[in-house]
């Protein structure tokens, strides 16, 4: 049962930096610049600590990809969001619905909360 295991660990190394940006004390970065570099590279960290780096050139190439120009296959139809707003009911019909909604009625003490047949 006792067998020799040949498990070896690789020493961890830091990600090499190619460019350092020195900021003076008191210099505030705008919120949009927190995860970017002066060269346009975007970087992020997952909750597990994995570092993700997106090169600007790669992102610009993805923008022109045919995949970005087609919607997902099983996308639901939501008027005004995933389909043009031409499917909406006329404005007059929507206003009539809003006028007759029970929420707009004034709450009086003599009206019961609901009706019940006994």
Curated annotation (Swiss-Prot):
Its main location: cytoplasm. It comes from the Eukaryota. The keyword Phosphoprotein applies. The modification Phosphotyrosine is found at residue 54. Disulfide bonds: none annotated. GO terms for molecular function: eukaryotic initiation factor 4E binding; translation repressor activity. The modification Phosphothreonine is found at residues 37, 41, 46, 50, 70, 77. One of its GO terms (cellular component) is cytosol. Repressor of translation initiation that regulates EIF4E activity by preventing its assembly into the eIF4F complex: hypophosphorylated form competes with EIF4G1/EIF4G3 and strongly binds to EIF4E, leading to repress translation. In contrast, hyperphosphorylated form dissociates from EIF4E, allowing interaction between EIF4G1/EIF4G3 and EIF4E, leading to initiation of translation. Mediates the regulation of protein translation by hormones, growth factors and other stimuli that signal through the MAP kinase and mTORC1 pathways. The TOS motif mediates interaction with RPTOR, leading to promote phosphorylation by mTORC1 complex. This is Eukaryotic translation initiation factor 4E-binding protein 1. The gene is EIF4EBP1.
């Amino acid at each position: 049962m006792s067998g020799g295991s040949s498990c070896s660990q690789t020493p961890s190394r830091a990600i090499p930096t190619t460019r350092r940006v020195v900021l003076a004390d008191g210099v505030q970065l705008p919120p949009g610049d927190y995860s970017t570099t002066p060269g346009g590279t975007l970087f992020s960290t997952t909750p597990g600590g994995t570092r993700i780096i997106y090169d600007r050139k790669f992102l610009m190439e993805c923008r022109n990809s045919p995949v970005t120009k087609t919607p997902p296959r099983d996308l639901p139809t939501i008027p005004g969001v995933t389909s043009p707003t031409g499917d909406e009911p006329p404005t007059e019909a929507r206003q009539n619905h809003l006028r007759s909604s029970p929420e707009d009625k004034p709450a009086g003490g003599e009206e019961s909360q609901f009706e019940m047949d006994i």
